[in-house]
Structure formats: C-alpha cells, structure tokens
Amino acid sequence: MILLDTNVISEPQRREPNAHVLDWIDAQALETLYLSTITVAELRAGIALMPVGKRQDSLRENLEKHLLPMFANRVLSFDMTCTKAYAELLAKSRAAGLAVETADAFIAAIALANGFTVATRDTGPFEAAGLNVINPWEA
C-alpha cells in the first residue's frame, strides 16, 4: 500500500503536470493508493489561501467532488498508534541532527504506523524515518 504525499496527489492539478508523475499514478492500482488526513488538510489549506477566482473554485470543486470521493475509505487518520511513531520519529531525527517539517513528520508517522510506502518528491525526511519511498518524478 502506498501513502501519497501532498506533492504527488496535487501534481495532476498543476497547469503543466509532470508527465512521469501522471504515468506513475496511472500505472498504480487505485485501491493501493491512500491519502492521509494531513494531506487533505494541506490540499484544503492550499486552495483556501489562493486568490479568489475561477482557478480556486475549480480546484476546490475537483477536490471535494472528485478526488476525495475517489479515496473514500482510503484516507488514513493520525491516531494513537501514530502518536507513538511520531514521537519515535522526532527523537530519531533529532539524534541524527535532522530537521523534519511538522506535516512531513505527521505523514511519515501515519505511514510507519500502518506499514505503508510513501510516494513523494521530497524523499529525504521519509527515508530518514526508515520508510520505503517512491519518487514518481524519477520512477
């Protein structure tokens, strides 16, 4: 199972999406792809922070009416098991002298707690957490 980082799931919505990422997504069995509640929050925040207009409306509609329904029952929450993985990840990162962004640490903890691979462009923090990582930009 693969947990999609925000940069992967948002790539198809870019004005000029990366062809490698689109091909990689198309090659995956949909039922193996998951989102986290952290990614959903980042997507919603990104849209909310955009200038008001047609692009914002279009992205919001696509997210709420198409993307999220496509991932129904495949959105992982940050639960009590994840809190332990998060604490261990932060301690391990600090001991190694690494800084991990808060959202990445939450997503990594969700993946660790559920035994998932992470698909992301920003591989460093997830590899440092000991996760299996796929970079669709290079796949």
Curated annotation (Swiss-Prot):
> Which cofactor does the UniProt annotation name?
Mg(2+)
The chain positions of domain PINc read: 2-136
Q: What class of enzyme is it?
A: hydrolase
- Tell me which residues bind Mg(2+): D5, D104
> Membrane: is it a keyword of this entry?
no
User: Does Hydrolase appear among the keywords?
Assistant: yes
Transmembrane parts of this sequence: none
Question: Do you know which SUPFAM superfamilies this protein is assigned to?
Answer: PIN domain-like
Question: Which Gene3D superfamilies does its entry note?
Answer: 5'-nuclease
Instruction: Report the EC number(s), separated by commas if there are several.
Output: 3.1.-.-
Q: Which domain of life is it from?
A: Bacteria
Q: From the UniProt record, which GO molecular function terms apply? A: magnesium ion binding; RNA nuclease activity
Q: Which UniProt keywords apply?
A: Hydrolase, Magnesium, Metal-binding, Nuclease, Plasmid, Toxin-antitoxin system
Described purpose of this protein according to its UniProt entry: Toxic component of a type II toxin-antitoxin (TA) system. An RNase. Involved in plasmid stability.
Q: Which family does it belong to?
A: Belongs to the PINc/VapC protein family.
Q: Which HAMAP family match?
A: VapC_Nob1
Name under which the protein is recorded: Plasmid stability protein StbB
Species name for this entry?
Answer: Pseudomonas syringae pv. tomato (strain ATCC BAA-871 / DC3000)
Q: Which gene encodes it?
A: stbB
